[in-house]
Amino acid sequence: FSMCEHHLLPFIGKAHVAYIPNGKVLGLSKVARIVDMYARRLQIQENLSRQIAEAVEQVTGALGVAVVIEAQHMCMVMRG
C-alpha cells in the first residue's frame, strides 16, 4: 500500500511491471524492492507509476518499461 499525498489515506493494490531488457535483467525480488521503496512515500498513483518506470529504466537501461497499478483508494471507498 501507499499513502495519498492529498488525503493522507492509504491506497491498496497491485503493481504490474514489465520491461524489454537491453542486456541487464532484474530478478523478481529487485523489482518488488523498487516498488516497495517508492510505495513508502506520500504520493499519488500516477507519480508512483512514473517513479517505478523511471527507476527500472535507469537501473537496467531497458528499451521500454510499462507499469500498471490497480489500486483501491480509501478516500473513495470511505465516501461510498
Curated annotation (Swiss-Prot):
Pathway: Cofactor biosynthesis; 7,8-dihydroneopterin triphosphate biosynthesis; 7,8-dihydroneopterin triphosphate from GTP: step 1/1. GO terms for biological process: tetrahydrobiopterin biosynthetic process; tetrahydrofolate biosynthetic process. Its EC number is 3.5.4.16. It catalyses: GTP + H2O = 7,8-dihydroneopterin 3'-triphosphate + formate + H(+). One of its GO terms (cellular component) is cytoplasm. It is an enzyme of class 3 (hydrolase). Keywords: Allosteric enzyme, GTP-binding, Hydrolase, Metal-binding, Nucleotide-binding, Tetrahydrobiopterin biosynthesis, Zinc. It comes from the Eukaryota. Zn(2+) binds at residues 4, 7, 75. It holds the Pfam family GTP_cyclohydroI. GO terms for molecular function: GTP binding; GTP cyclohydrolase I activity; zinc ion binding. GTP shows a positive allosteric effect, and tetrahydrobiopterin inhibits the enzyme activity. InterPro entries: GTP-CH-I_C/QueF, GTP_CycHdrlase_I, GTP_CycHdrlase_I_CS, GTP_CycHdrlase_I_dom. Toroid-shaped homodecamer, composed of two pentamers of five dimers. Belongs to the GTP cyclohydrolase I family. This is GTP cyclohydrolase 1. It comes from Mucuna pruriens var. utilis.
